[in-house]
């Protein structure tokens, strides 16, 4: 049974998707006015892992993550550079895919809508809110009237309207009826992109964008809505309010929010100037190391970014890979031990169950990784004893396949498992041996012997068997 910490209820809820064996999930994507930083990469990596795990457990996952390609930050960026907002969006969407390809996000089957491609869907929801009395037009702007949703507003962020009112600043322009009201549609201004609407030319507010895109691709009610902690209020609170009032569904059933990545003890953010771009980190650390670093902490807990932490993660990944390479390097033709590896098999089954148990408990990747390292330790112990039987080798191979599947397919951490001998890859050696076999079949003994002797000079000894040629160091 999978349990999810639901921000809406404030506790762990049993996960029961709306449709049997199918999960609908929407995660707020980036506003594409700059390159993404490591803090932006955290939700991308985590929710990609949620998707992978749910698929591993047999669910079909409909996963939507948007691009916000029109808002104040993008307009400011375009004006500063004296280019179109479309040019800014295209540049940074391209950069987003360049950067995230290194952290192995699963793009297959992914839906990535752009806000500007869904303006009509936004207008439809806004019109519904106006018709139902939850929104009003003022000088070409349209606002959601928060007090009309007094009983529901603040449910997600655990705030009440009275407290929000006391903390709200007084609006100078007096266009809004109340300081708490938020924009659904903004009247056109010079040097800003605009679209036709029943209220005149203008552009959408930020919050309505996600409501429209989640509705278009997942419906009025769906399973999981994800994003960073900083989005709970006002973004997600406003999303939920306008969607419930305008569309009539329950909107998201489970709300998941990841914690911040801090740098020098402060939340990483572009607005504060305290951030490190993902593409800059990728100059020094591989994307798979960054991905494992993110998964090494529970998603709701804050993380501290540092080179020290990344170097430790790199060492941990190398420990896994070195163990798996040891299995690949086994001299399989000379396995003569008596250990059937039943103890290792029992450990594998135990760790397999514990991995699922950890992931079922609110996707605890940190704990799940701990169980993986326990299994890696058990494998090394078995290999160190060097007493494996032929039957034991089958167990070793089963453990190998399981570890590769869990780490690469479920956690999404790519492994480098090519064995190298004196900087020559195992695959290259096999190719050379294939060429030698061809030479022998053609009775080109001189070439066959030359390949054998040259490999020996490199420290690689080959042995011709009846049906197969093997090699060892």
Curated annotation (Swiss-Prot):
Its main location: cytoplasm. GO terms for molecular function: ATP binding; cysteine-tRNA ligase activity; zinc ion binding. Binds 1 zinc ion per subunit. ATP binds at residue 270. Pfam families: CysS_C, DALR_2, tRNA-synt_1e. It is an enzyme of class 6 (ligase). GO terms for biological process: cysteinyl-tRNA aminoacylation. GO terms for cellular component: cytoplasm; cytosol. It catalyses: tRNA(Cys) + L-cysteine + ATP = L-cysteinyl-tRNA(Cys) + AMP + diphosphate. A motif ('KMSKS' region) lies at residues 267-271. Keywords: Aminoacyl-tRNA synthetase, ATP-binding, Cytoplasm, Ligase, Metal-binding, Nucleotide-binding, Protein biosynthesis, Zinc. Its EC number is 6.1.1.16. Zn(2+) binds at residues 28, 210, 235, 239. InterPro entries: Cys-tRNA-ligase (IPR015803), Cys-tRNA-synt_Ia_DALR (IPR015273), Cys-tRNA/MSH_ligase (IPR024909), CysS_C (IPR056411), Rossmann-like_a/b/a_fold (IPR014729), tRNA-synt_1_cat_dom (IPR032678), tRNAsynth_Ia_anticodon-bd (IPR009080). Its cofactor is Zn(2+). It is found in: Cytoplasm. A motif ('HIGH' region) lies at residues 30-40. The keyword Flavoprotein does not apply. HAMAP family: Cys_tRNA_synth (MF_00041). Monomer. Belongs to the class-I aminoacyl-tRNA synthetase family. This is Cysteine--tRNA ligase. It comes from Fusobacterium nucleatum subsp. nucleatum (strain ATCC 25586 / DSM 15643 / BCRC 10681 / CIP 101130 / JCM 8532 / KCTC 2640 / LMG 13131 / VPI 4355). The gene is cysS.
């Amino acid at each position: 049974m999978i349990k999810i910490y639901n921000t809406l209820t404030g506790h762990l809820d049993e996960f029961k998707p709306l449709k049997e064996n199918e999960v609908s999930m929407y995660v707020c994507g980036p506003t594409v006015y700059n390159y993404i930083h490591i803090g932006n990469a955290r939700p991308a990596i985590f929710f990609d892992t949620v998707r992978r795990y749910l698929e591993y457990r047999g669910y079909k996952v409909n996963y939507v993550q948007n691009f916000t390609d029109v808002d104040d930050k993008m307009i400011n960026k375009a004006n500063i550079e004296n280019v179109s907002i479309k040019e800014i969006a295209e540049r940074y969407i391209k950069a987003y895919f360049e950067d995230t390809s290194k952290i192995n996000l699963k793009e297959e089957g992914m839906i990535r809508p752009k806000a500007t491609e869904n303006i009509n869907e936004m207008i439809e929801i806004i019109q519904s809110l106006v018709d139902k009395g939850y929104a009003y037009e003022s000088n070409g702007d349209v606002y959601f009237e928060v007090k009309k949703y007094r009983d529901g507003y603040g449910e997600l962020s655990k705030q009440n309207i009275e407290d929000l009112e006391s903390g709200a600043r007084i609006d100078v322009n007096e266009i809004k009826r109340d300081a708490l009201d938020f924009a659904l549609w903004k009247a056109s201004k010079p040097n800003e992109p605009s679209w036709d609407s029943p209220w005149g030319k203008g552009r959408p507010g930020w919050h309505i964008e996600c409501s429209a895109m989640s509705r278009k691709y997942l419906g009025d009610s769906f399973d999981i809505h994800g994003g960073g902690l900083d989005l709970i209020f006002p973004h997600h609170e406003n999303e939920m309010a306008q969607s419930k009032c305008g569309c009539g569904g329950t909107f998201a059933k489970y709300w998941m929010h990841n914690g911040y990545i801090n740098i020098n003890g402060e939340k990483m953010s572009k607005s504060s100037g305290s951030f490190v771009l993902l593409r800059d980190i990728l100059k020094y650390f591989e994307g798979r190391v960054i991905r494992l670093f993110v998964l090494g902490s529970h998603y709701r807990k804050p993380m501290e970014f540092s080179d020290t932490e990344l170097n430790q993660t790199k060492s941990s990944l190398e420990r896994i890979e070195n163990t798996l390479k040891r299995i690949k390097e086994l001299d399989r033709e000379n396995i003569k031990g008596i250990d059937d590896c039943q103890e290792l098999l029992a450990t594998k089954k135990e760790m397999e169950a514990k991995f699922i148990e950890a992931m079922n408990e609110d996707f605890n990747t940190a704990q799940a990784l701990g169980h993986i390292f326990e299994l890696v330790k058990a494998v090394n112990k078995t290999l160190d004893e060097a007493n494996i039987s032929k039957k034991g080798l089958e167990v070793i191979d089963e453990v190998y396949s399981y570890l590769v599947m869990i780490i690469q397919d479920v956690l999404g951490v790519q492994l480098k498992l090519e064995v190298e001998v004196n900087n020559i890859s195992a695959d290259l050696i096999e190719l050379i041996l294939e060429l030698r076999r061809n030479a022998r079949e053609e009775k080109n003994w001189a070439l066959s012997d030359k390949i054998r002797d040259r490999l020996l000079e490199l420290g690689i000894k080959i042995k011709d068997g009846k049906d197969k040629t093997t090699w060892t160091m």
